[in-house]
Amino acid sequence: MSQSKPQFRTVEITLSAPFDGWTATMKAEGVPARVFIELQSGSAERALTALKRLVVKHNFLTDDGAPASDVLDAPMDALSDAITKWSDAVAALPPR
């Protein structure tokens, strides 16, 4: 019997002002336990590295207004808001 990869859900988040129009698609299921450990580590560097693993796509900008090719090039305030919005969105998902 061969294994198949489950179809995991994602959530769409929209950041708060002053990041109007900034959105991201983020993993809501199938997230490795290590990502949760890193988010709760108390280390900003480890938490941000974990955040990067959650983001599937985004339209974030750098501090000079250019598209951020790497989510970690976006302003810290935007990334903090993204983590909060992701947590709220995942908690609000109905059970399967």
Where are these regions (language model features)?
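A short beta-strand micro-motif
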Residues: 11-15
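Extended acidic low-complexity intrinsically disordered regions
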Residues: 1-10
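Short, surface-exposed, charged amphipathic helix/loop patches that serve as local interaction elements
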Residues: 8, 18-96
